[in-house]
């Protein structure tokens, strides 16, 4: 009888654990499904001028006459639509700072030119605006309520726009991080061990 009771108890524990894991997995999948439409890919470009020396000038005894050429460089980031009605997008300031062009790519592949509404270099935040219909936003949470050890999810475009809306997970590793780089750097960082790669910034 004791053996039977023990077996039933063990089966019940395993079933309960599987049920909890299943619920947890479903909850994460639901969060990802709801969040992804509000996450955007940010593609920026900048015109860079470089001085190049003319090889022909060198051979014709004019070696010190540089020739200026312009190059367009591109960078990638992510953002979150926080106000669908007004087309406001929240991202990191370093993603759009000093860029000549900013393009937003939505989850449905539509693309829009964006304008900068405001920036705060100290907190590394920027607000962009696009004129677009049929977009979804997501509400902002209260960072004062988070706790170390809580699960988090990151959605963004690591490395390439072809990898847009990649989902990674982790936990809150620490809160209130400040002066990581220097005394004038960002304040009150939230640290996470979720995979964050180039292109994820702002998501």
Residue ranges and their predicted role:
Residues 9-17:
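Hydrophobic h-region of N-terminal signal peptides that target proteins for export
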Residues 17-203:
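Serine-dependent protease modules
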Residues 1-9:
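Sec-dependent signal peptide recognition
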